[in-house]
């Protein structure tokens, strides 16, 4: 078969303008292969700019690339290997090995652009996926087959919480796909080593597009990880865990690509197609009658702004929202989850039962009231509160401290052994605190314990 070859006529950053024969223009989203002194890379057609010219985004390096260089139209979108061959491997955006092992033998390859499941194929039956992390299981439970977002600014513990969730949920069995989008290289290597030492790597695929790579790589690596998860769901009919760190970097890469194309941005400098790009991506993360994809996604908040357009565009697609707050981290309480800003549609009696629901509502009420009283305490002190309010403040502080927890993934740094808390122990502990059984105890005794059984 004759190769369809084009010629690069201009290079502007990562945007390539390429000339083809008029009758052989590649389609939008098709992959183009080009070579530099560093290796062979792909570009993606994003626009037809003339009768015989296209604009493409380089999904790789462009150093050393020059006008006049040849480009081969592959005739299809980027395709990545899927199935058993990629289990236990660390891959890049093209599905090529970056773990120092031989390339995965690609018996099957799937394009990274796929249609979302049809409405009649979706499975609406959901159940709770208990994580062993107290504040999540109590206040914002995760749905199996649902989408959960971890929102927070820089340095509040999103990645550590994500790694603990990977550790706790992966231990229950099943297949996992971790997609690192625009994050630090050391985090990817650290996660890979953690998975290897815990014995869950053989059932996990790690796909990385680091922050030092081109915006095209960071924009498309999320689709590579999602495609691998979709194959496990649709063809192997398995329940899959999809971890994405970080959705903001995916959006940011799209913004960079949009700017490179000269498109007019919206508020905050984001691309005008922000909602559609996020929607297309999120709608593919779905549970069907074949199997489920349970996704847990980190979302960075620029300047800790929960109203940032990137966060707002993501909110509507999620079943559970877990918000981490700097003021809680400053108190030394980890995970630094704000129970009042976090929510889950699974927190209703249908999913969790009446007892769990009522306890969660009481916890939210007592913490909200404590926040209101905190302003009085800051100005006038505890002495000005009524006896009833003083009792409420002490119980609220015990609850706040009790929701802290030592993690398995941070054992080597803290020297404290991680704890997985069963849901019954969690509910019994909260019940006892709310009922006043521990009113005589110090608030500090409730920091970083598992349940009431750990109180001496």
Swiss-Prot record:
Cellular localization per UniProt: Cell membrane
GO CC field: plasma membrane; proton-transporting ATP synthase complex
Catalytic activity, EC: 7.1.2.2
Residues reported to bind ATP: 152-159
Catalytic activity: ATP + H2O + 4 H(+)(in) = ADP + phosphate + 5 H(+)(out)
Keywords for the protein's UniProt record, in alphabetical order: ATP synthesis, ATP-binding, Cell membrane, CF(1), Hydrogen ion transport, Ion transport, Membrane, Nucleotide-binding, Translocase, Transport
Record's bilayer topology term: Peripheral membrane protein
Single GO MF descriptor: ATP hydrolysis activity
Pfam families attached to this UniProt entry: ATP-synt_ab (PF00006), ATP-synt_ab_N (PF02874), ATP-synt_VA_C (PF22919)
Family, similarity comment: Belongs to the ATPase alpha/beta chains family.
Entry-linked NCBIfam families: atpD
Subunit structure: F-type ATPases have 2 components, CF(1) - the catalytic core - and CF(0) - the membrane proton channel. CF(1) has five subunits: alpha(3), beta(3), gamma(1), delta(1), epsilon(1). CF(0) has three main subunits: a(1), b(2) and c(9-12). The alpha and beta chains form an alternating ring which encloses part of the gamma chain. CF(1) is attached to CF(0) by a central stalk formed by the gamma and epsilon chains, while a peripheral stalk is formed by the delta and b chains.
Protein name in UniProt: ATP synthase subunit beta 1
Protein species of origin: Listeria innocua serovar 6a (strain ATCC BAA-680 / CLIP 11262)
């Amino acid at each position: 078969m004759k190769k369809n070859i084009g010629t690069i006529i201009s290079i502007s950053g990562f945007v390539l303008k390429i000339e083809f024969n008029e009758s052989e223009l590649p389609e939008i989203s098709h992959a183009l292969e080009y070579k530099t002194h560093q290796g062979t890379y792909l570009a993606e057609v994003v626009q037809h700019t003339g009768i015989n010219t296209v604009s493409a985004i380089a999904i790789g390096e462009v150093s050393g690339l020059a006008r006049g260089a040849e480009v081969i139209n592959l005739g299809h979108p980027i395709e990545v290997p899927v199935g058993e061959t990629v289990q236990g491997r660390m891959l890049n955006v093209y599905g090529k090995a970056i773990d120092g092992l031989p390339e995965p033998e690609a018996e099957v390859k799937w394009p990274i652009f796929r249609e979302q499941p049809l409405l009649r194929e979706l499975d609406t039956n959901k159940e709770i996926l208990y994580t062993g992390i107290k504040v999540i299981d109590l206040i914002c439970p995760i749905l199996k087959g649902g989408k959960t977002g971890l929102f927070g600014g820089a340095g509040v513990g999103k990645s550590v919480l994500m790694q603990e969730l990977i550790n706790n949920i992966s231990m229950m069995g099943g297949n996992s796909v971790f997609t690192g989008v625009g994050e630090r290289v050391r985090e990817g290597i650290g996660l890979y080593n953690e998975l290897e030492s815990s014995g869950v790597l053989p059932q996990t695929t790690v796909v990385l597009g680091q922050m030092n790579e081109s915006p095209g790589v960071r924009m498309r690596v999320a689709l590579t990880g999602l495609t691998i998860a979709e194959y496990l769901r649709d063809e192997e009919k398995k329940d899959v865990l999809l971890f994405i760190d970080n959705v903001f970097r995916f959006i940011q890469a799209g913004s960079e690509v949009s700017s490179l194309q000269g498109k007019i941005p919206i508020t905050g400098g984001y691309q005008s197609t922000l909602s559609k790009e996020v929607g297309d991506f999120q709608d593919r993360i779905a549970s069907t009658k074949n199997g489920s994809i349970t996704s847990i996604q980190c979302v960075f908040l620029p300047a800790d702004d929960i109203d940032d357009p990137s966060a707002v565009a993501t909110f509507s697609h999620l079943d559970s929202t877990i918000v981490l707050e700097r003021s809680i981290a400053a108190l030394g309480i980890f995970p630094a989850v704000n129970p009042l800003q976090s929510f889950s549609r699974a927190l209703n009696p249908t999913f969790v039962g009446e007892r769990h629901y009522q306890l969660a509502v009481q916890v939210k009420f007592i913490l909200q009231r404590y926040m209101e009283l905190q302003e009085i305490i800051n100005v006038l002190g505890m002495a000005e509160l009524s006896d009833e309010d003083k009792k409420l403040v002490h119980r609220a502080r015990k609850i706040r401290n009790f929701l802290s927890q030592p993690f398995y993934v941070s054992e080597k740094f803290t020297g404290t052994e991680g704890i997985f808390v069963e849901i019954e122990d969690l509910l019994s502990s909260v019940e006892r605190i709310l009922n006043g059984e521990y009113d005589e105890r110090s608030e500090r005794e409730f920091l970083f314990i598992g349940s009431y059984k750990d109180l001496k």
